[in-house]
C-alpha cells in the first residue's frame, strides 16, 4: 500500500497507512483514530480472554493472563492485549520514519529532513543562537553572511564543486579550520580584557602595569588593582610578611631567588628544619632595596605553628614530671617559672632553647643597701622553716654559691632517678664559666626532631617590686598587664664582674617575669608591629653572628630586649604600614647606642647592660648595622 500524498509505498497494511497520514499529513480517517480503540473491561471481554488463555499453547501456559499474539510483521509475542497494542503502534511508527538519502539519519517526516549541524569540538564556545557566521565591519559590529550555513565547514557547494543537496557532511572532530582567520579582539574604551589569536579565553594574559600598582614580591610579580585585595592576599598567603608600603608599586625582577626559597622552607616538611641562619641566607642580604630585605627576613623567621605547639607540649610535660620528681627528693618545696622566647612568642628560628627557673616556695627578702645597680642580697623572710639554713652565712644572708651547688646536685639526682623515665633522654652539657644555668640536651624521641637545649636555672622569687627599679607606666599595654608585670621579680646567681665588698653574696636582679608580660602583650592595645620589629632585630643579630662568628660573642638578645622596651616608650605609633620606617629608625638608634657603649636597663636606668661587651665587638656591630641601612650588606 502507498500514500497518495507523499507517494510512499512501504506500508504493509491499511492501519500503518492511516497512522502515517495522521502523523505526517494530519489527515485522520472519519470514525477511526490513529490507534485501535482499547477494549473495555467487561464481563464479556474477561470471559473471552479467559477462553483464549485456556486454549493457549503449552510453552506459554505458565504465564497466566497472556496470549500468543502476532504483530503486523507476523511475529509471535506472548504479551497481554494492552502490550500488543503498544508494541504494534511503536513498530508501525518506527516503520513510518523517514531516512535521509545521503546521511541515513532518521526523521519523522519529509518536512523534518533538514541539514543537521555538526557537534561543536570539546572546549569550544557554542554560539548563543544558531545564526550564520559573522564578519567584521568598520564599526566592529558582527553581521551575517547570507547564504552560508552556520557550521564548522564554511565551504559552499559552488566553491567545492559539489552539490550536497542542502545537506553538509560531518566535520571530523578538531578539524574546525575556517578559510578566513577570525579577527583578534581589540581593546575598547572600557579596557576589557582582550584575546589574541590562538589564546584560550580562560587565560589571563595581563602583565603588571601602572593600572595594577600593588604587586606581591613573593608570587613572581602577581599584581592587584586595589590595595584591599593585595592586603588580603598577603594576610592569607604570606601571613608573616610585611605588606602595604613594602611591596607597593614594585615588580619582582626575579633576581631574588633566595626570597622564594626561604618562603618554600616554611611550607616544607616539619622534619626538614633549617638552622638559625641558613647556609646561604647571609648572601640574600645583598639586596639593594631595604624593603625587599624586610620581606626576605620576615619570610625566613616564620615557623610552622604545628611544630611549635608540639614542642611546647612535650617540654611542658617534661618540666611537670621533673618538678614532681624534684619535690619528692628535695627537703624544701620548689616551683617553676617558664621563660624565654617560646613563651613570649618572639621565637625566630628552629634552634629549640628553653629556660626554666626553679625557686623555693617560701618567703624571701631582698636587701639593696651597699649593692651595685642591678644586684641585691637575699635573706630568709619571716618563717619558721629551716630548710634553707644550711645555705645561710652567719649574718643570715643566702650564699649564692652554696645554693647553686645544692640545686645542681638536686637536678642531677632527679634526672638520674629511676622513677623519672624521661631523664634517660637527657644529656648533661658543659656550661660556660659563671653561668647560672644547669644545661641539658633533651631528646624528644620524635624522628627528625633535634634535641632541645634546656637551661635549668636556680633562682629566688621575691613577691614585690625592687626598690632600685623605676615605676614603669607603659601606655602601649593595658593597666592590668602592668600590674601583673610589677607583682614580683627574681634573683639569679651571676658573679659581679668587678671587685666588690661582699661580692660573693650578690645576686643578679632578673626582671624575667616583667619582660615576659610586657613583650607577650606588646600589641594588645594597638594591633601594630612592635613584636615584628623585635623579631627582625633578633634576626639581624643572628645574621651578624653568622657572618662574624669569631668576633661577635657577648652581644645577645637580652641587650636587644632592653633597647626595644625603651624604643617602645619613645615612639607613639606602631601601625603596620609604618613597619619599614620604624625598623630603619630602630636600627639607626641601636647602632648609635652600641657604638657609644650604653644600653640602659629598662627597669634600672643606672645599669648599663652592655658594659661587658668589648669595644672591638661593639665597633663591628655598629659597622654592620650602618652597612645594612646603606644597602651594602
UniProtKB/Swiss-Prot annotation:
<protein>
    <recommendedName>
        <fullName>Cyclic GMP-AMP synthase-like receptor 1</fullName>
        <ecNumber>2.7.7.-</ecNumber>
    </recommendedName>
</protein>
<feature type="region of interest" description="Disordered">
    <location>
        <begin position="250"/>
        <end position="276"/>
    </location>
</feature>
<keyword id="KW-0067">ATP-binding</keyword>
<feature type="compositionally biased region" description="Polar residues">
    <location>
        <begin position="68"/>
        <end position="80"/>
    </location>
</feature>
<dbReference type="InterPro" id="IPR024810">
    <property type="entry name" value="MAB21L/cGLR"/>
</dbReference>
<dbReference type="Pfam" id="PF20266">
    <property type="entry name" value="Mab-21_C"/>
</dbReference>
<keyword id="KW-0479">Metal-binding</keyword>
<keyword id="KW-0808">Transferase</keyword>
<dbReference type="InterPro" id="IPR046906">
    <property type="entry name" value="Mab-21_HhH/H2TH-like"/>
</dbReference>
<keyword id="KW-0391">Immunity</keyword>
<dbReference type="GO" id="GO:0045087">
    <property type="term" value="P:innate immune response"/>
</dbReference>
<feature type="binding site">
    <location>
        <position position="353"/>
    </location>
    <ligand>
        <name>Mg(2+)</name>
    </ligand>
</feature>
<feature type="binding site">
    <location>
        <position position="355"/>
    </location>
    <ligand>
        <name>Mg(2+)</name>
    </ligand>
</feature>
<keyword id="KW-0548">Nucleotidyltransferase</keyword>
<feature type="binding site">
    <location>
        <position position="455"/>
    </location>
    <ligand>
        <name>Mg(2+)</name>
    </ligand>
</feature>
<comment type="similarity">
    <text>Belongs to the mab-21 family.</text>
</comment>
<keyword id="KW-0464">Manganese</keyword>
<feature type="compositionally biased region" description="Basic and acidic residues">
    <location>
        <begin position="29"/>
        <end position="67"/>
    </location>
</feature>
<dbReference type="GO" id="GO:0003690">
    <property type="term" value="F:double-stranded DNA binding"/>
</dbReference>
<keyword id="KW-0547">Nucleotide-binding</keyword>
<dbReference type="Pfam" id="PF03281">
    <property type="entry name" value="Mab-21"/>
</dbReference>
<dbReference type="GO" id="GO:0005524">
    <property type="term" value="F:ATP binding"/>
</dbReference>
<keyword id="KW-0238">DNA-binding</keyword>
<dbReference type="GO" id="GO:0046872">
    <property type="term" value="F:metal ion binding"/>
</dbReference>
<dbReference type="InterPro" id="IPR046903">
    <property type="entry name" value="Mab-21-like_nuc_Trfase"/>
</dbReference>
<dbReference type="InterPro" id="IPR013087">
    <property type="entry name" value="Znf_C2H2_type"/>
</dbReference>
<dbReference type="GO" id="GO:0016779">
    <property type="term" value="F:nucleotidyltransferase activity"/>
</dbReference>
<feature type="compositionally biased region" description="Basic and acidic residues">
    <location>
        <begin position="176"/>
        <end position="194"/>
    </location>
</feature>
<comment type="function">
    <text>Nucleotidyltransferase that catalyzes the formation of cyclic UMP-AMP (2',3'-cUAMP) from ATP and UTP and plays a key role in innate immunity. Acts as a key sensor of double-stranded DNA (dsDNA), the presence of dsDNA in the cytoplasm being a danger signal that triggers the immune responses. Directly binds dsDNA, activating the nucleotidyltransferase activity, leading to synthesis of 2',3'-cUAMP, a second messenger that binds to and activates Sting, thereby triggering the immune response via activation of the NF-kappa-B transcription factor.</text>
</comment>
<feature type="compositionally biased region" description="Basic and acidic residues">
    <location>
        <begin position="250"/>
        <end position="274"/>
    </location>
</feature>
<feature type="compositionally biased region" description="Basic and acidic residues">
    <location>
        <begin position="125"/>
        <end position="143"/>
    </location>
</feature>
<feature type="region of interest" description="Disordered">
    <location>
        <begin position="23"/>
        <end position="80"/>
    </location>
</feature>
<keyword id="KW-0399">Innate immunity</keyword>
<feature type="region of interest" description="Disordered">
    <location>
        <begin position="107"/>
        <end position="214"/>
    </location>
</feature>
<keyword id="KW-0460">Magnesium</keyword>
Amino acid at each position: 500500500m502507498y500514500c497518495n500524498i507523499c507517494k510512499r509505498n512501504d506500508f504493509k497494511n491499511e492501519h500503518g497507512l492511516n497512522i502515517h497520514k495522521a502523523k505526517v499529513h494530519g489527515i485522520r480517517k472519519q470514525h477511526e483514530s490513529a490507534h485501535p480503540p482499547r477494549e473495555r473491561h467487561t464481563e464479556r471481554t474477561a470471559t473471552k480472554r479467559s477462553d483464549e488463555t485456556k486454549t493457549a499453547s503449552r510453552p506459554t501456559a505458565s504465564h497466566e493472563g497472556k496470549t500468543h499474539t502476532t504483530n503486523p510483521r507476523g511475529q509471535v509475542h506472548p504479551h497481554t492485549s494492552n502490550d500488543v497494542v503498544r508494541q504494534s503502534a511503536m513498530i508501525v511508527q518506527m516503520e513510518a520514519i523517514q531516512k535521509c538519502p545521503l546521511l541515513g539519519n532518521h526523521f519523522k517526516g519529509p518536512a523534518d529532513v533538514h541539514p543537521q549541524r555538526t557537534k561543536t569540538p570539546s572546549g569550544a564556545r557554542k554560539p548563543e543562537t544558531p545564526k550564520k557566521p559573522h564578519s567584521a565591519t568598520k564599526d566592529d559590529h558582527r553581521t551575517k553572511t547570507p547564504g552560508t550555513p552556520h557550521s564548522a565547514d564554511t565551504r559552499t557547494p559552488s566553491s567545492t564543486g559539489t552539490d550536497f543537496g542542502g545537506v553538509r557532511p560531518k566535520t571530523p572532530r578538531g578539524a574546525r579550520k575556517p578559510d578566513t582567520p577570525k579577527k583578534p579582539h581589540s581593546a575598547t574604551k572600557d579596557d576589557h580584557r582582550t584575546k589574541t589569536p590562538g589564546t584560550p579565553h580562560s587565560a589571563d594574559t595581563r602583565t603588571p602595569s601602572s593600572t595594577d600598582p600593588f604587586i606581591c614580591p613573593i608570587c613572581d610579580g602577581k599584581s592587584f588593582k586595589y590595595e584591599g585585595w593585595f592586603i588580603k592576599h598577603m594576610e592569607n598567603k604570606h601571613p608573616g610578611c610585611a605588606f602595604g608600603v613594602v611591596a607597593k608599586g614594585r615588580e619582582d625582577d626575579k633576581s631574588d631567588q633566595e626570597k622564594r626559597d626561604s618562603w618554600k622552607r616554611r611550607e616544607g616538611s616539619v622534619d626538614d628544619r633549617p638552622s638559625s641562619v641558613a647556609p646561604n641566607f647571609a648572601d640574600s642580604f645583598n639586596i639593594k632595596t631595604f624593603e625587599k630585605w624586610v620581606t626576605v627576613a620576615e619570610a625566613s623567621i616564620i615557623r610552622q605553628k604545628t611544630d611549635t605547639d608540639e614542642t611546647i607540649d612535650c617540654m611542658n610535660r617534661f618540666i611537670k614530671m621533673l618538678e614532681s620528681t624534684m619535690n619528692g627528693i628535695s627537703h624544701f618545696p620548689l616551683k617553676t617559672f617558664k621563660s624565654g622566647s617560646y613563651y613570649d612568642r618572639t621565637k625566630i628560628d628552629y634552634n629549640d632553647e628553653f629556660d626554666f627557673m626553679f625557686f623555693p616556695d617560701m618567703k624571701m627578702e631582698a636587701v639593696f643597701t651597699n649593692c651595685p645597680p642591678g644586684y641585691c642580697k637575699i635573706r630568709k623572710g619571716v618563717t619558721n622553716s629551716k630548710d634553707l639554713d644550711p645555705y645561710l652565712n652567719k649574718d643570715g644572708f643566702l650564699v649564692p654559691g652554696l645554693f647553686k651547688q645544692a640545686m645542681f646536685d638536686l637536678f642531677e639526682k632527679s634526672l638520674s632517678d629511676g622513677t623519672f623515665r624521661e631523664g634517660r633522654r637527657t644529656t648533661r652539657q658543659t656550661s660556660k664559666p659563671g653561668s647560672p644555668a644547669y644545661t641539658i640536651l633533651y631528646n624528644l624521641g620524635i624522628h627528625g626532631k633535634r634535641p632541645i637545649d634546656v637551661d635549668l636555672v636556680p633562682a629566688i622569687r621575691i613577691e614585690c617590686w625592687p626598690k632600685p627599679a623605676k615605676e614603669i607606666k607603659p601606655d602601649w599595654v593595658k593597666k592590668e598587664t602592668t600590674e601583673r608585670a610589677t607583682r614580683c621579680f627574681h634573683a639569679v646567681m651571676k658573679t659581679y664582674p668587678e671587685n666588690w665588698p661582699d661580692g660573693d653574696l650578690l645576686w643578679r636582679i632578673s626582671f624575667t617575669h616583667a619582660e615576659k608580660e610586657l613583650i607577650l602583650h606588646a600589641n594588645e592595645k594597638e594591633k601594630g608591629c612592635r613584636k615584628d620589629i623585635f623579631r627582625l632585630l633578633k634576626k639581624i643579630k643572628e645574621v651578624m653572628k653568622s657572618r662574624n662568628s669569631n668576633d661577635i660573642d657577648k652581644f645577645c638578645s637580652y641587650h636587644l630586649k632592653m633597647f626595644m622596651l625603651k624604643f617602645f616608650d619613645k615612639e607613639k605609633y606602631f601601625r603596620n604600614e609604618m613597619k619599614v620606617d620604624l625598623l630603619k629608625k630602630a636600627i639607626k638608634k641601636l647602632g648609635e647606642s652600641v657604638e657609644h657603649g650604653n644600653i640602659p636597663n629598662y627597669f634600672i636606668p643606672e645599669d648599663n647592660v652592655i658594659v661587658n661587651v668589648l669595644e672591638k665587638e661593639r665597633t663591628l656591630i655598629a659597622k654592620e648595622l650602618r652597612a645594612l641601612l646603606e644597602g651594602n650588606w
